[in-house]
Regions:
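N-terminal amphipathic/hydrophobic targeting modules at extreme N-termini
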Residues: 2-9
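Bulky hydrophobic segments
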Residues: 14-178, 183, 198-210
């Protein structure tokens, strides 16, 4: 009887371990697949169109792999924190430090001695795959920033702060000849911020920062 109970206990623990291991493997593979798709099929082909940024990325042979690994680990670790309904403030600091650095590089290092003005809010509605991909990335880039605002700000504060930030970025790109001041960029970036803000509001109701 004792032996049977001990054996049952062992198999239960073994079953729990195998289940957790399978979850780790499946979520890890899913995070890698999603990261690979975003970086390899969307981000890199679009960003390498800019010669200056392409040269910057080419200086390090493993730029693409590094970005895929970073995004994969970020998503993978986030899943486990979400499942525990707790998120580490250290995780947030590390992820956002890298994110803000990468955002700066993408926004201010992709072009040199170039500026133009576009007042058409829908200039991305064209039959050009690269422009459509870039429009998608303009939304995607700013989702984490919107989530960052969502940690503390109220809706009115978020609207003001996010618009000022985005318009400021567009103005700096134009003034310093490193990009275009485009109404469409402002709208797409702000859409990304809005998505990130509401995602964060939802997550705040489900998780606790520790």
């Amino acid at each position: 009887m004792v032996i049977s109970t001990s054996a049952d206990h062992f198999f239960i623990k073994a079953g729990v371990f195998v289940r957790k291991l399978l979850i780790y493997m499946i979520t890890g593979f899913t995070a890698w697949l999603l990261s690979y798709s975003i970086i390899h099929w969307i981000a890199f082909p679009t960003l390498t169109h800019y010669q200056k940024l392409a040269r910057v990325m080419a200086r390090y042979e493993y730029t693409e792999l590094t970005l895929i690994v970073f995004l994969s680990l970020s998503l993978w670790l986030f899943y486990f924190q979400f499942s525990r309904k707790k998120i580490s403030v250290i995780y947030l600091y590390l992820v956002y430090s890298v994110y803000l650095f990468l955002l700066f590089v993408v926004l201010f290092a992709k072009a040199s001695h170039y500026h133009s003005l576009s007042l058409d809010p829908f200039d991305f509605f064209v039959k050009d795959k690269r422009i459509i991909m870039e429009a998608f990335l303009n939304v995607l880039y700013f989702i984490p920033l919107g989530a960052l605002y969502g940690l503390k700000t109220r809706i009115a504060e978020f609207v003001f702060a996010s618009l000022i930030t985005i318009i400021g970025i567009e103005t700096l790109q134009y003034v310093f000849y490193v990009g275009t001041f485009a109404i469409s960029d402002i709208l797409l970036n702000w859409l990304g911020c809005i998505i990130g803000y509401w995602i964060c509001r939802f997550l705040r109701s489900q998780m606790k920062v520790i």
